[in-house]
Amino acid sequence: VYVWRTRGVVMAALMGVGALGGLMMLPSRRQEMEVSEASAMGRVESWYEGIQMFIGSPVFGIGAGGYSDLHELTAHNSFVLVLAETGIVGFTVWLAIVGYCFRMMLAIVERGDDIIDDVPLEVPDEVALKDWKTDKALSLCLLLSLTGFFTAAFFLSRSYVVILYLLVALVVGHYTRMRATYPSLPVFSLEKDLIRWPSYAVIGVIGLYLTVKVLLAMA
């Protein structure tokens, strides 16, 4: 999250991939880090099967619950599962929901204390600043919760679990209240992002495909 906030998404992604590659090349007794280890290889093969299902039905996918009907294991990757079962259309929508949650919390966390100028003049500055610090801390907590959940979700099938959508509801509710209190916070609208999310979805598909190919080649 720190690298993402200070250096940007691309740098964070590159550092993440580099760190993963470095860990996998280090000699270690932690067998779960080895791609060639049986359970890890089974996980990668599950990702590969999900990609193949997507290639077979790229627009709307194979349908909810279809992955487990066609493969003996779960996808072990929430992104692959959504991609396989809902196609590029569903993946784009799901990615937009996730992406907006991150953008909302980042918009608050990255905002300076000058935002208290939005607060009515009758509220003392020290009170307004204290309330803003509390709201900002809560936003950071929600951002870290999102980060933790989706870090785990990359290795587990958690695409449809209720806890995800409760977390989404908390984030949206919190941002709605923050927008009412601090009107200078940005408004997020699909009308402004009609190109953004389909583009990110395509980039995500390519990234997943290349990741699987690299891991299979390393096995």
Feature annotation, model-predicted:
Residues 1, 10-15, 91-96, 161-166:
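Transmembrane-embedded, aromatic-rich helix segments that form part
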Residues 1-26, 197-206:
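Hydrophobic alpha-helical segments of polytopic membrane proteins
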Residues 51, 80, 84, 93, ...:
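Generic hydrophobic alpha-helical scaffold/packing signal
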Residues 1-4, 22-27, 96-109, 154-158, ...:
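Structural signature of transmembrane alpha-helix termini at the membrane-water interface
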Residues 10, 145-153, 157-219:
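Transmembrane alpha-helices of multi-pass inner-membrane enzymes
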Residues 1, 88-145, 171, 176:
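Hydrophobic transmembrane alpha-helices and their immediate junctions
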Residues 9-18, 31-39, 181-190:
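A cytosolic-side transmembrane-helix exit/cap motif
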Residues 37-94:
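TM-adjacent membrane-interface loops and short helices in multi-pass inner/ER membrane proteins
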